[in-house]
């Protein structure tokens, strides 16, 4: 296991373009998490399998906690919690809504599509939190890094759970007849 050294930031670093970028990326993921709080109930309702429905409902509770954690992060770095529209998450959410619109109710095929959309969201969040944690450490924001590390671990677990559910959903969907 490799370790990453964290070099505390100087006063200059905290007033740098890197600091500005860090705050913009926090605003981006803050918007994304808030969007998911609104979207996950729709995904849960559209899910065919009870296991997938429960996974989305459980992750909704975690996502609400992620929003709260981000508010703590903003506070810990002396910034007010503001959002900046996350175009990546907006696109992923739109794709998920299209899947719901374009698939039949109560089918495993819909679940497969919802899992794809869910995992795309998770992977975006995993990448974003991974980068933000390193920036926080570089800038000397250890409390922010700890808060986001807890969120990152939950995102990884949610992704793993979706991967597990996909195995049975994919098999079930492969048995559904093709509609003409």
Where are these regions (language model features)?
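Amphipathic alpha-helical hairpins
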Residues: 1-180
């Amino acid at each position: 296991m490799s370790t990453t050294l964290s070099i505390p930031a100087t006063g200059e670093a905290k007033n740098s373009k890197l600091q500005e970028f860090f705050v913009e990326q926090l605003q981006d993921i803050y918007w994304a998490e808030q969007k998911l709080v609104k979207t996950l109930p729709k995904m849960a309702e559209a899910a065919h399998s009870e296991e997938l429905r429960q996974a989305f409902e459980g992750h909704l509770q975690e996502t609400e906690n992620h929003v709260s954690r981000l508010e703590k992060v903003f506070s810990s770095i002396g910034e007010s919690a503001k959002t900046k529209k996350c175009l990546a998450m907006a696109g992923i959410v739109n794709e998920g809504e299209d899947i719901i619109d374009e698939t039949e109710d109560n089918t495993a095929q819909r679940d497969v599509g919802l899992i794809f959309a869910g995992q795309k969201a998770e992977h975006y969040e995993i990448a974003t939190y991974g980068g933000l944690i390193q920036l926080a450490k570089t800038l000397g924001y250890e409390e922010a890094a700890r808060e986001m590390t807890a969120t990152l671990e939950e995102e990884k677990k949610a992704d793993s759970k979706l991967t597990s559910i996909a195995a049975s959903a994919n098999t079930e969907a492969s048995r559904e007849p093709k509609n003409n």
